[in-house]
Amino acid sequence: MDIFRILSRGASINKKKDQTSTNSSLIKLSLPSTANKHEHLLDEVERETDFFRTKSHRKLDEPSSKILKSKNKDEERESVAEIVPPLELESEEDARVFRNLHKSKVTGDDIPIPIGSFQDMIGRFKIDKRVLSNLLDAEFVEPTPIQCEAIPITLANRDLIACAPTGSGKTLAFLIPLLQQLVSQNVLKNHGIRGLIISPTNELAVQIFQQLEIISKGKGLNIAILSKQLAGKISNDVVKASKYDILVSTPLRLIDVVKLGKVDLSKVTQLVIDEADKLFDHGFAEQTDELLSHCTNVKIRKSMFSATIPSGVEEMAHSIMKDPIRVIIGHKEAASNTIEQKLVFTGNEEGKLLAIRQMIQNGEFKPPIIIFLQSITRAKALFHELVYDKLNVDVIHAERTPKQRDEVIKRFKNGDIWVLITTDVLARGVDFKGVNMVINYDVPQSAQAYVHRIGRTGRGGRSGKAVTFFTKEDDKAVKPIINVMKQSGCTDGLSDWMEDLGKLSKREKRAVKTHEIERKKISTVPSVIKQKRKQRQNMIEASKRRKQAESEQ
């Protein structure tokens, strides 16, 4: 919808004169009253300019009489929930048609039929009414393909390996069945941690916890995110970890309190490993293994989710799971089809800054935008360059405190910041629904990293754009990116000569993943001026040394 059309909208006149009085009355009922026209228009304009949908809005065509909250709203909802709807997917043939439609590949033994709607869970799994009510209140009306497959598999107590594109609803796909499994158990308070969700980054853990809070409202479950403060309280016996039913955490922080004997994971029956490819990668694999060794319950059910699952990760998953079912939505290493992808050759490092400024000049730079770089030093340098260009920009990296990072994310989601510069610390999981563009200022070191980075745009069915800059030094690193673009059907963003680049050998792939490319400093200052600045700085330092030597004599 065009905001300028909204602002210039006039009356719509129906020229047909042969309508019955009944039709006329129906038309009159559907139009907003004169008293509500102004409010209706303002609400519509506000909705158009709210990039990230952070504000609550009523439906535009909702009559004003329905805006008032009903006193017995909860009773009405419960009465609706009590009506068991017919199953939308009832047979293997229905499941086959559904999977072909959504390009879902499901393998394993005794695979459950997917659900066709959230209401299907009432008849099939006796879903808790309050959980369903919370979903509807949060406007989660229709399940996504990964949710349709993962929920019945988990509720059938099966281990699960799930791979689906970024922004496809994987978080709810594991939270809904986890909640249902726990609320259906009759256990005493302070029984211990029964649900455990492991995430590679604090930002993703916070996001999972926030969604968990929404859909578990009113169920009396104690849930927590293992923040630095909570870990300190548990370590010093100020808080008992056994009071919590569900815990969300990053691996290392949880290991620290487990080693102290302050957290017992032997009661965990539902284990979720989010962003599994990262948690089984070299940097996290040992930590993940150590946590798994403490989850000793014989009834434990494990599931792992990610947008990319390499074959090595799948092998590790099979070694720790019991007869898992494997669900792949789309392609294992393809990006979402809502993202338009493009590769831009900039020649050298200076060309990248010029390319960004050219995009601004040509009107291609459409906020909100996230820009990814390979290191903290480079992220800081680009931040200072773009601040100099008077762009509304901020930066997030590992050197900033969690509080500072949370504040920047909040401001970005609220639209106060239009361009967010970051490292791979924000590449996974964090949900920014309104991001229009992702720019890979530096080529990511693997196809998986690329898919996760560009997955910050094109989420929840919205369209997005991803632009990747590369130089002569990136001739090898860019090849996996080209493969992802081909698998995603984005060949329009490739030049003909790019498609002819050969494949990497195993040794070359390993080298690209493990060795960052050495790049020049980010700056458009000519080398002559840089040299003069350096000479001047050397002269100043020499002068200081002379003065100090003279004063000591």
Curated annotation (Swiss-Prot):
Residues 151-327 form the Helicase ATP-binding domain. InterPro entries: DDX52/Rok1_DEADc, DEAD/DEAH_box_helicase_dom, DEAD_box_RNA_helicase, Helicase_ATP-bd, Helicase_C-like, P-loop_NTPase, RNA-helicase_DEAD-box_CS. GO terms for cellular component: cytosol; nucleolus; small-subunit processome. Its EC number is 3.6.4.13. Disulfide bonds: none annotated. It is found in: Nucleus, Nucleolus. A motif (Q motif) lies at residues 120-148. Keywords: ATP-binding, Helicase, Hydrolase, Nucleotide-binding, Nucleus, Ribosome biogenesis, RNA-binding, rRNA processing. ATP binds at A164, P165, T166, G167, S168, G169, K170, T171. Residues 528-553 are annotated as: Disordered. Its main location: nucleus. The keyword Nuclease does not apply. Transmembrane segments: none annotated. ATP-dependent RNA helicase involved in 40S ribosomal subunit biogenesis. Required for the processing and cleavage of 35S pre-rRNA at sites A0, A1, and A2, leading to mature 18S rRNA. The Q motif is unique to and characteristic of the DEAD box family of RNA helicases and controls ATP binding and hydrolysis. Belongs to the DEAD box helicase family. DDX52/ROK1 subfamily. This is ATP-dependent RNA helicase ROK1. It comes from Lodderomyces elongisporus (strain ATCC 11503 / CBS 2605 / JCM 1781 / NBRC 1676 / NRRL YB-4239) (Yeast). The lineage of its organism: Eukaryota, Fungi, Dikarya, Ascomycota, Saccharomycotina.
